[in-house]
Amino acid sequence: MAESHGEAKGTASAHTEAEGGHGFPPFQKETFPSQIVSLVITFVALYVIVSRLALPKVGGVIDARQKAIDGDLAEAQRLNDESEAAMKAYESELAAARARAQAIGAETREKLAASSDAERKALEDSLAAKLAAAEKSIATTRATAMSNVRGIAADAASAIVQQLTGKAPAGKTVEAAVDASLKGTA
């Protein structure tokens, strides 16, 4: 194991040194100016390639994305404005519908009140007419009954007097007594 470690150490130094024992070329001071020139040329070439080819493509993609974003925002604003306008129209239509409903309700209440007043008046008139007819009928019935009562009372009084006295009283005397009794002047 010690041997393999020594071999590894020998191969490591072999990789860092050139065949002539000069070491790793990028670390040699003699090649620094040429390496720096190569580095500058490489970076200039890379800059030109990136600035001429890659940056315009990336810029185009960024511009396209920005235009798409702006378009989407404009579309969203337009749709928002449309929805707000539709909401305002809906609210105004709803308010108008409520006003119409209230007007229809008030009109219906007025019609129903007028109709019920007319029906009530007609019913009152009908009841008043029926009451007048009933009162007239009662008065007629009373007059008829009273005339019958007078005759019945006269006959009853005559029969009572005859029972008590044994003699039939005069018809005119009995009728005068019944008339006085019916009028309340006994």
Swiss-Prot record:
- Tell me which Pfam families the record gives: ATP-synt_B
As for subcellular location, the record says:
Cell inner membrane
How does the record say this protein sits in the membrane?
Answer: Single-pass membrane protein
**Which cysteines are cross-linked by disulfides?**
none
Alphabetized, the UniProt keywords read:
ATP synthesis, Cell inner membrane, Cell membrane, CF(0), Hydrogen ion transport, Ion transport, Membrane, Transmembrane, Transmembrane helix, Transport
Q: Does the keyword Ion transport apply?
A: yes
GO molecular function terms noted in the UniProt entry:
proton-transporting ATP synthase activity, rotational mechanism; proton-transporting ATPase activity, rotational mechanism
In residue numbers, the region (Disordered) covers 1-26
Residue ranges crossing the lipid bilayer per the database entry: 33-55
Listed under GO cellular component are: plasma membrane; proton-transporting ATP synthase complex
- The stretch of residues making up the signal peptide is none
Family of this protein: Belongs to the ATPase B chain family.
- Role summary: F(1)F(0) ATP synthase produces ATP from ADP in the presence of a proton or sodium gradient. F-type ATPases consist of two structural domains, F(1) containing the extramembraneous catalytic core and F(0) containing the membrane proton channel, linked together by a central stalk and a peripheral stalk. During catalysis, ATP synthesis in the catalytic domain of F(1) is coupled via a rotary mechanism of the central stalk subunits to proton translocation. Component of the F(0) channel, it forms part of the peripheral stalk, linking F(1) to F(0). The b'-subunit is a diverged and duplicated form of b found in plants and photosynthetic bacteria.
User: How does this chain assemble?
Assistant: F-type ATPases have 2 components, F(1) - the catalytic core - and F(0) - the membrane proton channel. F(1) has five subunits: alpha(3), beta(3), gamma(1), delta(1), epsilon(1). F(0) has three main subunits: a(1), b(2) and c(10-14). The alpha and beta chains form an alternating ring which encloses part of the gamma chain. F(1) is attached to F(0) by a central stalk formed by the gamma and epsilon chains, while a peripheral stalk is formed by the delta and b chains.
Spell out the protein name for this chain: ATP synthase subunit b 2
Gene assigned in the entry: atpF2
